Structures are given as C-alpha cells and as structure tokens.
Amino acid sequence: MLRRICLLDRPIPAPNHSTLKNILEYALTRDGVPYRPFGPARWGWGAYTFPDPDQPQRFLLIGLGWGSADPHYMDILDHLTPARLHESAAEAGIDWPSSKIQDDAPLLSPDMLLVRPITPIRVLESVPSGRRPAILQLNEDWTIALNRTMSYRLGRPFHLQMQQDHLFTATQVSVSSRPLSQTTRLPGITASFVLRAPTEFSHELSVVWASGLGANTGMGFGWIHDGLTPAPF
C-alpha cells in the first residue's frame, strides 16, 4: 500500500476536479502508465481542501494526494515528483513552486472515512442470469453489493459499512472507449458519506481509498476531503 500527498507552500483556489485528475494522469502516462478509461481503478487520488475564510462559498486547495494497492502503480507513483506535476499543470495555469511530497497523513479516524467521491460508484444487483442492473439507492442492498464487488475485485472479503451524509445524486459515468472515440456510459452514484469498517478490518478503508469503490471506475478514483485545514499535515 502506498499513499502520498503533495503539500503546497500556500493554499490556492481549488481548481475543478477534472483539472486535478488530468494533472496526475498526464504525469503518469509520461512515466509509462497506459491510459485505461475502462475497468476497475488501479489507483486513487484526493484533493485536500478547506473553506476560504474570506469567501466561505469558495474552497482552497492545500494538497493533492495519490495512492495505490497495485504493485505496478505503487512503484510508479512512488517516484512522482513536484516537477512532474508542475510540467503537467503548466498549461492549466497551476503552479507547485515550493511543494513537497510526503507520506500521506493517517486517516482522521482508524475505522472511519468521511469523504465525498468524485468518481461515480457503480455496483450491480446479484441476479441468476442476464444483465445485472445498477443499484442507485444507498441502502442495505447497495452496501452488500459494494462489499461483494470489492471482494470480487481484490480477492478477499470486505466488511465496509456506509452511513449516508447527504442525498445521493444519480449520474452517468464513462466506463469504456470504443472505436471512433465513442464511449459507453452506465449509471452510477455520487454522494457524501461516512464509510466505516469494524476495528479489526480498519485497513480496508486505506485499501478502498487507493483502489476505488465499485466497478468500472476508469483509470483513477477521485475523492474530495472538504473542510480539512493544513493542521493535520
């Protein structure tokens, strides 16, 4: 398991989520990671933000984190430098002048992860045969299906528990590329929630942060950590 965070020397207005993901994807593809717009995520990333004291409706970015539980991606992510981020962000108008990379801070609670996924989460009903419909309500069935999906992906049981924080939003997620630049879009959900695991399985939270939730999540899975000041780092 690898988790890193690039801390800025000063907060900046938080760019949009696509810009942040593009910065990391560009840096990784330059280092030989193939672009994979389909299949389960192999790595995760997170934007660390907090409210602007002068403009409460605006958020400031203090750090950009990344991680993976995949050995191949761990090795490449371990060598990602501020210079690489600066090169890939140049055209986006983002500068990382005196940023530094360090091991990511531990989760604020060992058995709880309070996050807002950027990447839509797709889990499917278990049916005997035929096409499996997506579950678009955050309920007990969704949690059961999520643990089943993660167990299938990573080859071991999962014991995640979800507590909804806000109403979910159904959305459409691109899951694969087709010839002539066509894409297949399937439904998933995004929501703010508290993700828990029993104390004896608390390591599962770090695993899903670095591996994404659900299936068909594309190249990387994104999280927003809102309301964090620089203090925890």
Which residue ranges define each predicted feature?
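RNA-interacting cores
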Residues: M1-F233
